[in-house]
Amino acid sequence: MSASPLKVAVTGAAGQIGYSLLFRLASGSLLGPDRPIELRLLEIEPALKALEGVVMELDDCAFPLLSGVEIGADPNKIFDGANLALLVGARPRGPGMERSDLLEANGAIFTAQGKALNEVAADDIRVGVTGNPANTNALIAMSNAPDIPRERFSALTRLDHNRAISQLAKKTGAKVTDITKMTIWGNHSATQYPDIFHAEVKGKNAAEVVGDQNWIENDFIPTVAKRGAAIIDARGASSAASAASATTDAARDWLLGTPAGDWVSMAVISDGSYGVPEGLISSFPVTTKDGDWTIVQGLEIDEFSRSRIDKTTAELADERNAVTQLGLI
């Protein structure tokens, strides 16, 4: 067992996603059975008592890999020396709130967290943002952490990616492990574009295997894009366990690398690839190695895909303009 634990900070740690996520992290789902983990858990003051209860449960699991837990409400204390920060906590949209209100409320949270990460996180920090609106929250945190390389920030579109794989497997009768090269483009919102035109089912082009453009356009894409709303409708609460699982998947692949011959979807800072304006945090197909990601290049984008990428990118640009006007970036 490696001597030095990975210091993992989790925000919103007493929330629904946090509750599912912490036990995955502590059990070794992130880096396997040989690397201990130290959890550093951030919550707002009113939730600290509930978080103490979660820590009691973590203690009761006697996880061999869990080397320590620290909790608190001060990001400068909790992020101190963190190697990985998973920003799960965010202000949910309440009754009567406009989207601009949501952006402003979360802006304050992610501004403070970005500044704290900039001051006290470890030199090798990687920051994954799960709390919504994830792409723009990541942009705000990144903009407030000028000393951390911009490539170290990513927003979660892995849940959408996993949802897309599951739907394609169901349609084709394949196993999820048979499906490679799935891509989510754009925003983690209803405008996202799940793209199967470069995906493969057992090495064959997925769109050709499906052979049904109507299903792709009118069933697959809206099912993936609106899956979160469907889960709320069915269970009366938002998807938490699946979001925690995707958060773990995304962090693991970022740190340990993607398999040969495959890629994953991550929302990362655009360099202008595929016509996505530079500086937006948008989902792309990426490969990862040694903690760094690279956008997959050279994919052909047809008119059908182009219009959908442009639509979700326009929404991201609108969100960036809104938080710029609010003075958050």
Swiss-Prot record:
CDD domains xrefs: MDH_chloroplast-like (cd01338)
Gene from which the chain derives: mdh
UniProt keyword list: NAD, Oxidoreductase, Tricarboxylic acid cycle
EC number: 1.1.1.37
Entry protein name: Malate dehydrogenase
NCBIfam families: MalateDH-SF1, PRK05442.1
Single GO biological process annotation from the record: malate metabolic process
Annotated binding of substrate, by residue: 93, 99, 132, 163
